[in-house]
Amino acid sequence: MEPTVHTKEEIIERLRRISSELRELSVERLGLFGSFARDEQRDDSDVDILVEFAPGRKNFDNFMNLNFKLEDVLQRHVEVVTRESLSPYIGPHILEEAEYVSFGN
């Protein structure tokens, strides 16, 4: 089991390490937002992830499997949201703050 992530850089490195598994789940983009993106995380902070799936591939199984995989790899509670699920009030802030992780094609 991997140790718990403590920095934004550790999160990005681990996400890149599992890029092939992310592609198998039809993930096209991942964006980090929240306390880790702002370098304001605490020991009990969760990891906030914005996900974009390939067209027609967003489904319950891919969403839940992504959530389980991220929690396993990062060893933290993870909140995964899609662009479509964002509130019209907070969504623009999240989209502006999100730092997208490049993990190849």
Outline where the language-model segments fall.
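Catalytic core of pol beta-like nucleotidyltransferases
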Residues: 1-29, 37-43, 56-105
